[in-house]
């Protein structure tokens, strides 16, 4: 096992049982897991499932509360869809194509063509009653080809999930919409993940086309690209004016359909400065033309200009988790932690041990019934230090609850809550009358920890599990 200083996100993901380690062996077969899953396709494990489902729930409700329509689209489509969108012409080498009964299909590399079809369907049914801007959100799975040599852990994969949304917006409102998306990104990063968004931690990269390759690698005309890039430059300037976040420009890094703002997190780790790309906001003037949105919107809404904003607040969920695990050294916010409460029964070898065990068991069951992910660990006075070191270096629960003879006698629980901002545990003394009272008081601690999440999505997700075997 790597030391704390040498650990990568792969080590942390394995310790927390978030993912299966590809090079570990499958029992009986004596072959690596990657032999069966394939390179670049992460297999999320028991600790990773709750993270993904909880994150999906928070993000879906957050977006719904902000006027997005939550959708789900198929994983495959006829290549006729991707011919219209331009993916076959400009993105074919990054796609997985296959034949079904003589017809060519593709595993979707992006969600945008499907989202545009949904808009066209709603316009056909409801015409100008449909609101503009029209916003759809999907916690959507996509697949893109990556050379085997570039695949690495969760950071570079072939199959990944995006917190993906598309906004169909009249031309005069593009800059306001782009700025609003940045504010949404800031809310999610700060309230759910405790990541400060400031001039010290973030910068904005305006990724532009290479004008010499327009028509070859980038769709559209030079004039369209220059207009779109200027609109994003103005939106980025507004972000800079309010938050002081620096803007850099990079030629040739745009998407094939339009320029984009990429948000780069800067972190200092072991004296080494690292930059990680997080979310993205992309300006698209090509797909509206290819799907004839200009004609539809002009006819139904009387609007001459319409564009599409592609945006992902976190980007690739897999990549984001990899970066976050490395940055936070395996610590997760309470809402997403695989183990939210670890109940540690510290036995003494005396008659009180039965009371200690009964109380620990009752508290764990009560927390589980309330929807929390819980683990119970039996320990002793002599083995406690070793057990705590093991727990903190592997499972890393969000909250540790210690129950020993003193806690039983004095009716006060010894609770240690991990704080992501200080990266230390803070100690709480939680008084209780009986086990049910202890459960309610611990649930109140959880509600306080989840308060920022509730401000995003209205409520905190509850995905219970008994993970005692992990300790």
Swiss-Prot record:
The EC class name is: ligase
Q: Which GO terms describe its cellular component?
A: cytoplasm
Q: How does it assemble?
A: Homodimer. Probably interacts with its editing subunit.
- UniProt keyword list: Aminoacyl-tRNA synthetase, ATP-binding, Cytoplasm, Ligase, Metal-binding, Nucleotide-binding, Protein biosynthesis, RNA-binding, tRNA-binding, Zinc
Specify where the region named Catalytic lies, as residue ranges: 8-333
The residues that the entry says bind Zn(2+) are 112, 166, 310
Q: What else is known?
A: There are two ThrRS in this archaeon. The first one (APE_0809.1, this entry) is most similar to bacterial ThrRS but it lacks the N-terminal editing domain. The second one (APE_0117.1, AC Q9YFY3) is most similar to archaeal ThrRS but lacks the central catalytic domain; it probably does not aminoacylate tRNA(Thr).
**SUPFAM superfamilies in the cross-refs:** Class II aaRS ABD-related (SSF52954), Class II aaRS and biotin synthetases (SSF55681)
Q: Does the keyword Cell membrane apply?
A: no
Task: Output the Gene Ontology terms for molecular function.
Answer: ATP binding; metal ion binding; threonine-tRNA ligase activity; tRNA binding
Function summary? Catalyzes the attachment of threonine to tRNA(Thr) in a two-step reaction: L-threonine is first activated by ATP to form Thr-AMP and then transferred to the acceptor end of tRNA(Thr). This protein is probably not able to deacylate mischarged L-seryl-tRNA(Thr) as it lacks the appropriate domain.
Q: Read off the lineage from the record.
A: Archaea, Thermoproteota, Thermoprotei, Desulfurococcales, Desulfurococcaceae
Q: How is the cofactor bound?
A: Binds 1 zinc ion per subunit.
List the CDD domains hit by this protein, alphabetically: ThrRS_core
Native source organism of the sequence: Aeropyrum pernix (strain ATCC 700893 / DSM 11879 / JCM 9820 / NBRC 100138 / K1)
Protein name (Swiss-Prot/TrEMBL): Threonine--tRNA ligase catalytic subunit
Q: What is this enzyme's EC?
A: 6.1.1.3
